[in-house]
Amino acid sequence: NGEGENNYLIDWEKPLIGEAAQDLGHFLAPTTTYWKTDVLLTKEQKHDFVKQYQSCCKNTVEYEELQYRTDRYETMTCLRGVTWCAMAWVEYQDPNRPIQNQATYQKIQDYLTEDFLNWIWNSYFA
């Protein structure tokens, strides 16, 4: 909703009571935030989001533990996102592919650039 406004995390894909860190990791991962926008959150922005989320949990979870688990899920989400993009890129090479979306194809190509892949590597694995 923007700077100074309330923002909410709602899992529309599989609404169930589960691991909050998994939803947070998916929501904050660059392979999610950058998909339909040009937003790449800083580490500080992501940690601030987790702190705000944790403060709403009425102390049912310790911040350090939640941040640790969120970081692990975020890493795996990045791996899944990049490998999905590699698969989608191959699919888009077929000129008879029934669905072609130029914006999606461009974003897939963005994710597979050496700069983006190096950024993921340095952010999560170096």
Model-derived segments and their meaning:
Residues 21-59, 75-94:
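Active-site activation/catalytic loop segments of kinase-like enzymes and analogous catalytic loops
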Residues 17, 43, 68-72:
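Amphipathic, non-membrane alpha-helical segments in soluble helical-bundle scaffolds
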Residues 37-40, 64-67, 94-100:
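Short, surface-exposed loop/turn segments at secondary-structure junctions
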Residues 81-126:
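ATP/Mg2+ or Mg2+-diphosphate-binding catalytic cores
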Residues 5-8, 40-48, 99-111:
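Glycine-rich, flexible loop segments associated with nucleotide phosphate handling
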